[in-house]
Every structure is written in structure tokens, then in C-alpha cells.
């Protein structure tokens, strides 16, 4: 287990079927895999296939935080796509780049166009439909349009083809309900997402959802339930060798004890969690020591 940052951009491509034409073994991709993004830009420009050239160029620009150039490259790749699936990936990535450049409304229009394109293939492009629904949900969530995000995420879950996709949708659904302050629903879907993450072996996201649930229980006036979750997470982290989540669970326990008026246990948990976080250099967990 290790801490993971939340990335909006999709880098895992499913170009394993004949419906995709993109060559993921090109030199640009290989350079990006090693973190050489600017070198990948130069390599992409030398690729002869126009779709591969512009698509990988867009990814390399995006990874280099050059969002406007990425958007243009993805637009060019869409125009050069010979297969519908390649076209839809260009639309998908363009929408993500637009969102991350701050153009949420334009991004949502792009995702909606992609969704309509995917629907033209009936069930052939259900995976692409799910991706567009999920990204539309992300956009709605980011602008606090919780009812819309719930609708998009719910639809994405229905057509998910594996537990990883279902976990992802359930996770975001819990956040949308939390945004609406529907705490019982937020807890319900956080639990479902947590169990699904555990089933798939995604221990980082499992731990994060346990932390979310603890917060929801605390805000739902159930501090004892929150504490039990955090104590179980602390033990789970120990068993799986994650001092980061062990420290995080202890620091969260401190907050729960403080809410209950138990200063002695609050300080004790804080000090233990602080010392662990300090020993592993987890700066994001290091508030001023009491």
C-alpha cells in the first residue's frame, strides 16, 4: 500500500482489440513510460502515422502541463482517426485536457459529443459510453451539480464490465451523495466501493474509502462507528505494511476522540500518528505537534 495522488487523466489504454488502431509500442509512448515527456514530444513529431503522431503528441503535451497544445493535438488526432474507437479516445482525452485547462463547460460538451458517438455503435462501444458517462459525472461533481453527477455515475455503473469499473463508479457516487449531505447514502455507497476495492486488491483506494466512511459517520453523529472503522483500518494498515495509513488512521482517531471530549486519548493518538508520519517523511500528515 502507498499513497496515490488523484489523477484525472487516463493513461491505461485498452488497445488490445482489433477495434483499436493506435500503436502503443511507438517511441513516443516508450519515452513517456520512462517519464521523458519532452523527449516524447520530439519523438511523436517523427511518427509517420498521422493518428499515432497527434494522439501521442497530445498525451506528451498533457503530461508536460501544456494543456492548450494537448487539446490541439487531440483535435488533430480525431481528424486523422480511421477507426471509431480511436476517434472516441481522442474525444475523451481532449475533454479531459479541456477540463484541466479550466474549460469545464467546453469539456462537458466534448464528453457529450463523445457519448453520442459511442451510442451509435449500440453495444459495441459500451466501454466508451461508460468512460464518457464517468467523465461527465466528474465534471458535474467538480461544479457541485450533485444530482447530475449522481445520474451520470449511476448510469456508468450499470454498464461497467468489471469490478474495477464498478468500484470507481461507486466511489464517485458516494462523494456525490456526500456533497448533497445525504450521509446515509454516502455511507452506503462508500461501503460498497470499499468492499469492491478490497475485492480487486486495490488497497490504497480501499483505505481511502474507509477514511471517507469514518468522516461520514462522524458528521452523521456516530463517533463510535467512526472510531471502530479507524481502529480496524489502523490494524489493517499494520497487517499490510503501510505506515502511511497507520499514521493517517491514528491522526483521524485523534479527531474523533477530540469530538467526544476525550482529550487524553486524542493527544495520545495524535502523538503516535505524528511520530509515525514523521519517521516516514509523510509531510502531508504533519500538522504542528501539540
Located regions from the model:
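N-terminal leader/linker segments that initiate helical-solenoid repeat arrays
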Residues: 18-68, 75, 84-85, 89
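Short coil/turn linkers that connect adjacent helices within long alpha-helical scaffolds
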Residues: 47, 80-84, 120-124, 159-163, ...
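Residue register of alpha-helical TPR repeats
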Residues: 52, 89, 127-131, 168, ...
